[in-house]
UniProtKB/Swiss-Prot annotation:
Keyword DNA repair attributed: no
Domain of life (superkingdom): Bacteria
Predominant cellular place of this UniProt entry's protein: cytoplasm
Keywords: Cytoplasm, Gluconeogenesis, Glycolysis, Isomerase
Gene: tpiA
The protein's name in its UniProt record: Triosephosphate isomerase
NCBIfam families attached to this UniProt entry: tim (TIGR00419)
Natural source organism: Idiomarina loihiensis (strain ATCC BAA-735 / DSM 15497 / L2-TR)
Subunit and partners: Homodimer.
Cell compartments where the protein resides: Cytoplasm
Amino acid sequence: MPNASLVIANWKMNGNRELTKTMSAALREKLNQLQQVKLVICPPFTLIGELANQCYYDDIAIGAQNVSEHTGGAFTGEISTAQLQEFGVSYVLVGHSERRQLFAETDKMVNEKALATVNAGMTAVICVGENKAQRDEGNTWEVVAQQAQAALADLPKEQAGKIVLAYEPVWAIGTGETASPEQAQDVHAKLRALLVEQFGAIGEKMPLLYGGSVKADNAAELFAQKDIDGGLIGGASLKESDFVAICQAAQG
């Protein structure tokens, strides 16, 4: 049986106004069959308002792909927590591997963004994961643990309910490769222990998502793992039929 309760779509720099309409309509048709699964869509910033309007009466949460650690000021091109909240955003991706690799986001920045997000009352979806060289060298857990511990630093226990961890093996993002259910579960089990160590019993209930080429045909097997509570979906979240099928796999 699936263990999933949260599925997040990350559209990255894709999509348009038409996709907000067709995707929300496709999900709306199936919402009564997906009552055990929380659905979140993270579109590009320019589509947040449009998607929020499309989903106004639906149980579909709106997420952002990034946020500034600053509250405002002379930070050209950045966006604050307050500006996101004005458009109904309740989830924020923090530390995605593409932000770390392409935009030089450091562990310190990821931590500051996570703190800014939860302090504003939104849920921070903190992304961690190793690249292929690190996995091949046997350093998967060392890398993942270091990223997770750095991102969670100074987060008080009372904020634990506003934290989601997403394990995204970098070598499996957009490559067609996927960690086996057993490989993913191994990392998730260790992340679960890390959360319990830092936050106590509530760590048992904090969502752990898998992100790394999740597709309609492998979602059910991944979601059946004990410590995989859902998915962070990239490419497959851009096609209505594929994303609906993944959400249905989470529901079981």
